[in-house]
């Protein structure tokens, strides 16, 4: 096997680099901006976000009373300020004879996340796969990378995690592979938490003599949630107590089924220390990448993702970037998250100065006017003035915008079932299995518990990152939370619930599941009125006068009219309520009053009017 460090650009001549840079097409950022006017266009109601009933009624040219009545008849108690969700607006549009469509308004604040690159197929070239090596501490991640890139990086001590974040490229059998060398799954999950699709393939390192450990399981959780293909590398096969079948079984329990067991996950056996299985691993990566058909356009200005950024004493703000598409070059004008600048200097993974970087290439640049965040998208354009304006606006918007709450635990699946995502950590396996058993026995119609992760040990920052990504509630049993992790959870908007009595967890989860369900709306009888006198009014119709027999009558409540024990009308809203000339909110038993009903005038003296409210009740 011959493995050697790949050069960033094939340097047959300096003229080739210059030709690549000069021939790149520009990215027209302004053409990506899209202003969406909410309203009816050609019989279609177009909207960008949720609206109140008052706002929605004006946009579709309907009286708000029609909308409120429709929702009341559906059992939904509401008013002008009630916020309608996407489903409700769609239902109302269909009720009033309109089709509906949600569109995304793209502006300077969100264009990096929504920009679409429509590269012609003939401009696309194969790009190297980006691979993240993950696994438990001391199972051989760093040794594996050392062996692959043929450099003697000092091995980490047992119990520690590689501190630097970087990326490396190797060439094998004329194929480039980019390895994302992280402190483990932490950086990987941070990227996913902000929506950055950084990694194509995950290589999961498992020690043959140790099997799956907590960090291995965490790595699997992150990879599965991100839907990234997994290749398992069983390391330390030279150990006497290697137990492959045990590892296959443990992987199957985590929904990773190996090819040997009839699944699709490739497993490579070897020893990173003794250079065994490396060829097979690289071949597996290339095969997986071929199946994925990874391509990008190198013939335009570049865009990509930020790996990490920091302040360098000598160079100012520096950022480690990954080129996803296009070609990045020195002297390019670049916007990275909120910050912009001119690429003054660019180095590759060997810290060797380079002039250009192709897709899937990791680089470090200097020249920005601030420090971006990990996961920030970036883009290059020829218009320096525009980038400066965008940078200033994005920074201003960030200052004005309140921090979003990433800890919302409520999700809804495609069947309309409400889901509560939970990450569970306990002190030992016995309590873990007991709690999982109790939670599996909970049955709440219309709601479902989804255990995103269940493991032994203290809560850590990786758990918080996964909770943020999956919008999960964190539940811990008989374990402590360090002040560092607690502060991190607070900063991420994640709720941690700590228990020491198992049944309290079951009760709380059951309560939360019931709480996320939409309330059940029922009719609550509040009074009755006998009609004794009628008046006609030219503008408001028939006014019914009567005495309250029981309970009370309220304005905006509903009425059901009984005439000789026969129901004449129901669901009629009480529009106005008066005592003499005074408008009143309610009248109690024994009092006289006059009132009108919405869309009903056919009263008869002697009618009994049953008064009720529609109230929401929680699920019990």
UniProtKB/Swiss-Prot annotation:
tr-type G domain segment(s): 126-295
Record's subcellular location: Cytoplasm
Stretch list, region G5: 271-273
Main subcellular location: cytoplasm
Record region (G3): 181-184
GO cellular component: cytosol
Family membership: Belongs to the TRAFAC class translation factor GTPase superfamily. Classic translation factor GTPase family. IF-2 subfamily.
Descriptive protein name: Translation initiation factor IF-2
Species for this entry: Malacoplasma penetrans (strain HF-2) (Mycoplasma penetrans)
Designated gene of the protein: infB
């Amino acid at each position: 096997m011959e493995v050697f460090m790949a050069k960033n650009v094939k340097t047959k001549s300096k003229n080739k680099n210059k030709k690549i840079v000069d021939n790149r097409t520009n990215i027209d950022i302004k053409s990506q901006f899209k202003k969406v006017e909410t309203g009816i266009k050609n019989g279609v109601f177009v909207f960008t976000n949720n609206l109140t009933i008052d706002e929605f009624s004006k946009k579709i040219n309907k009286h708000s009373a029609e909308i409120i009545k429709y929702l009341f008849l559906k059992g939904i108690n509401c008013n002008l300020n009630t916020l309608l969700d996407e489903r409700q607006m769609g239902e109302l549009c269909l009720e009033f004879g309109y089709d509906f469509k949600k569109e995304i308004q793209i502006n300077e604040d969100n264009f990096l996340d929504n920009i679409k690159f429509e590269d012609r197929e003939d401009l696309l070239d194969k790009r190297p796969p980006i691979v993240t090596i993950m696994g438990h501490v001391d199972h051989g991640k760093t040794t594996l990378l050392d062996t692959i890139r043929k450099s003697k990086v000092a091995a980490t001590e047992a119990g520690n995690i590689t501190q630097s974040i970087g990326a490396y490229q190797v060439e094998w059998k004329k194929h480039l592979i980019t390895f994302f060398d992280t402190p483990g799954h932490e950086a990987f999950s941070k990227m996913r938490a902000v929506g950055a699709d950084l990694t194509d393939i995950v290589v999961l390192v498992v020690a043959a003599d140790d099997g799956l450990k907590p960090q291995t399981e965490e790595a699997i959780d992150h990879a599965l949630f991100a839907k990234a293909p997994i290749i398992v590398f069983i390391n330390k096969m030279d150990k006497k107590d290697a137990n492959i079948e045990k590892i296959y079984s443990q992987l199957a329990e985590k929904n990773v089924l190996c090819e040997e067991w009839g699944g699709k996950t490739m497993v490579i056996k070897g020893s990173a220390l003794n250079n065994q299985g490396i060829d097979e691993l690289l071949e597996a990566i290339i095969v997986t990448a071929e199946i994925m058909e990874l391509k990008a356009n190198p013939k335009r200005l570049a865009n990509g993702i930020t790996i990490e950024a920091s302040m360098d004493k000598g160079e100012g703000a520096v950022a480690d970037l990954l080129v996803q598409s296009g070609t990045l070059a020195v002297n390019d004008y670049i916007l990275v998250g909120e910050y912009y600048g001119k690429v003054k200097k660019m180095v590759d993974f060997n810290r060797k100065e380079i002039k250009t970087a192709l897709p899937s290439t990791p680089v470090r640049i200097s020249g920005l006017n601030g420090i971006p965040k990990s996961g920030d998208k970036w883009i290059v354009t020829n218009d320096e003035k525009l980038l400066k304006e965008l940078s200033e606006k994005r920074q201003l918007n960030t200052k004005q915008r309140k921090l979003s709450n990433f800890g919302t635990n409520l999700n809804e699946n495609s069947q309309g079932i409400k889901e509560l995502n939970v990450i569970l950590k306990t002190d030992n396996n016995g309590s873990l299995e007991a709690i999982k058993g109790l939670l599996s026995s909970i049955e709440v119609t219309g709601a479902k518990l989804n255990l995103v992760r269940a493991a032994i040990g203290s809560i850590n920052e990786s758990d918080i990152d996964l909770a943020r990504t999956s919008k999960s509630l964190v539940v811990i049993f008989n374990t402590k939370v360090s002040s560092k992790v607690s502060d991190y959870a607070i900063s991420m908007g994640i709720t941690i619930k700590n228990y020491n009595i198992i049944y309290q967890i079951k009760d709380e989860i059951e309560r939360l599941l019931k709480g996320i369900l939409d309330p059940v709306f029922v009719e609550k009888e509040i009074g009755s009125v006998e009609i004794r006198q009628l008046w006609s009014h030219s503008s408001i119709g028939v006014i019914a006068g009567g005495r309250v027999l029981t309970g009370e009558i309220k304005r905006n409540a509903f009425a059901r009219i009984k005439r000789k024990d026969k129901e004449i009308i129901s669901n009629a809203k009480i529009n106005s309520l008066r005592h003499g000339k005074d408008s009143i909110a309610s009248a109690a038993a024994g009092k006289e009053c006059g009132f009108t009903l919405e869309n009903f005038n056919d009263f008869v003296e002697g009618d009994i009017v049953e008064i009720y409210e529609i109230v929401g009740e929680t699920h019990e």
